[in-house]
Regions:
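Surface segments flanking catalytic/ligand-binding clefts of nucleic-acid enzymes
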Residues: 97-273
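Short gly/ser-rich loop at a beta-strand->alpha-helix junction or flexible surface loop bordering the NTP-binding
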Residues: 1-117, 232-273
Length: 273
């Protein structure tokens, strides 16, 4: 990276996927072989196959991160929104908000700009929530929202003033918590802790349901069925149509990753219409 940085013109900085990775933001699964990305205002740009230059107007604001030039966080988000699907942008935006790299006021200012990517970023801002603590928590939340299930992230369940648990998602108006169970929940010690936590939640009369990436990506109907039952409404799988639309346009699918390559001019534009 330092070798590439030495090739950048003054006033240029890393952006897009490269900038997000430098800041430690969550990203969707990405295609292999992506170049590094930098932004600059100058027409003259270094020509290297491993570096993609994105021209921006006005000239980007540059700071230093671990000795490398990087554009402002809002500029990174706008650059990603030029090429990412909506679901992908929400995942990254949730991460930036969660880490405090973007404040609500900074985001609001960025959304007034006449820049490439601003329309998708505006839409993502209506769906974003910095309380998410992982990318799949974001996906689980958006699945519920797309199915018209109102949820509250990071809900604190208390009894007699004592904190029993903090749940990923509370289905509003019910006694049900829906949570994402990632790889970290598979160790023996964590499994024991989870079982103890489940018993504590059950003792209060609440229900805790855990889901993995399998349900979120491939069997979302299982999650919807649980939510419909909890809400006491008829189960209607067509409610998932909006979720499938979001998913198809994202890098969480092979077609979405191919579409990203096409948008970047790096793949076959006919491979993902």
């Amino acid at each position: 990276m330092h070798a590439l940085a030495s090739q950048l013109h003054r006033g240029a900085g890393f952006t897009h996927v490269t900038g997000a990775q430098m800041r430690g933001w969550w990203l969707p699964p990405l295609p292999t072989g992506l170049p590094e990305f930098a932004a600059q205002n100058s027409r003259n740009r270094p020509r290297r196959p491993e570096l993609r230059i994105i021209r921006t107007t006005p000239e980007p604001e540059i700071s230093r991160l671990r000795g490398l030039p990087i554009v402002a966080s809002t500029d990174i988000l706008l650059a990603l929104a030029r090429h990412f699907g909506l679901l992908d942008v929400v995942v990254v935006l949730d991460s930036a908000l969660h880490l405090g790299d973007v404040t609500p006021s900074q985001l609001a200012d960025a959304l007034t700009a006449r820049r490439f990517g601003v329309r998708r970023l505006r839409l993502a801002a209506t769906l974003a929530d910095g309380r998410s603590e992982s990318p799949y928590e974001t996906l689980l939340r958006l699945l519920h929202v797309a199915c018209d299930v109102a949820v509250v992230p990071q809900h604190e369940l208390r009894e007699d003033g004592r904190l029993v648990a903090r749940g990923d998602l509370w289905i509003l108006g019910t006694n049900a918590l829906h949570e994402y169970d990632g790889v970290g929940h598979r160790s023996r010690d964590q499994h024991r802790s989870d079982l103890r936590r489940d018993r504590d939640i059950g003792a209060t009369g609440w229900v805790r349901r855990g889901y993995t990436d399998l349900e979120v990506l491939r069997r979302p109907v299982d999650i919807l069925r649980d939510a419909d039952r909890t809400l006491g409404r008829d189960h209607d799988p067509s409610r998932l149509d909006a979720w499938y639309d979001l998913l198809r346009g994202s890098c969480f699918t092979a077609a979405g990753r191919q579409r990203l390559l096409a948008r970047l001019g790096l793949g076959d534009p006919m491979a993902a219409p």
